[in-house]
């Protein structure tokens, strides 16, 4: 199956919504209001089938800080799983992160083996170290304090804040150093 990986457009949001719905019904992805998808469409890339133009996968790269971003909402249509579409899409997100100058990529996932193939490692509970950083992602205390001001749930999940733990669905937090 041949697909083209490209930036998402507003006309793709309905297809992205459908992909998310499939995964959120199964408790794999958190549901997002459609308005949030439109607001963040510039963060998304999609995989489009070359033979019929159908969007069969999506993924987003959300920048959290100067050197930190999150891979979000990576979803592949069931009919396309096992064909490397998700891997190609993730590689495009990582390429985008490199281009932006982001050095660390975070994800919250059930798909630990998939992300591990790309170099992601599981991270544990955040703890402050003697040098003023927060393990395991090594965030300086001043940056941590700034990130606490964010209203973004993904930032709260990365920081492992108590208020979002019920929403993380038992996912693993993973980190990649580029």
Regions found by a protein language model. Give the residues of each.
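Short amphipathic alpha-helix that is part of the acyltransferase structural core
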Residues: 1-31, 48-49, 54, 150, ...
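Terminal substrate-recognition subdomain of acyl/acetyltransferases
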Residues: 98-99, 106, 110-178
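Conserved glycine-rich acetyl-CoA-binding loop
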Residues: 54, 77-88, 100, 117
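A generic "binding-loop/recognition-motif" signal
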Residues: 12, 67, 110-111
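Conserved acetyl-CoA-binding loop-helix of GNAT-fold acetyltransferases
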Residues: 82-95, 107
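A conserved beta-strand-loop-helix scaffold within acyl/acetyltransferase catalytic domains
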Residues: 31-45, 49-50, 57-76
């Amino acid at each position: 199956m041949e697909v083209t990986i490209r930036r998402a457009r507003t006309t793709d949001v309905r297809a992205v919504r459908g992909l998310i719905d499939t995964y959120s019904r199964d408790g794999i992805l958190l549901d997002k209001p459609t308005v949030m998808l439109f607001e963040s469409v510039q963060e998304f890339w999609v995989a489009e089938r070359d033979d019929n133009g159908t969007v069969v996968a999506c993924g987003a790269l959300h920048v959290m800080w100067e050197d930190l971003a999150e891979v979000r909402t990576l979803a592949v249509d069931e009919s396309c799983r096992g064909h490397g579409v998700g891997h190609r899409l993730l590689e495009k997100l990582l390429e985008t992160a490199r281009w932006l100058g982001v050095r660390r990529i975070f994800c919250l996932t059930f798909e630990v083996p998939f992300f591990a193939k790309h170099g992601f490692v599981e991270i544990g509970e955040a703890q402050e170290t003697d040098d003023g950083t927060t393990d395991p992602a090594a965030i300086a205390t001043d940056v941590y304090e700034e990130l606490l001001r964010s209203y973004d749930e993904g930032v709260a999940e990365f920081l492992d804040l108590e208020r979002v733990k019920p929403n993380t669905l038992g996912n693993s937090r993973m980190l990649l150093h580029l």
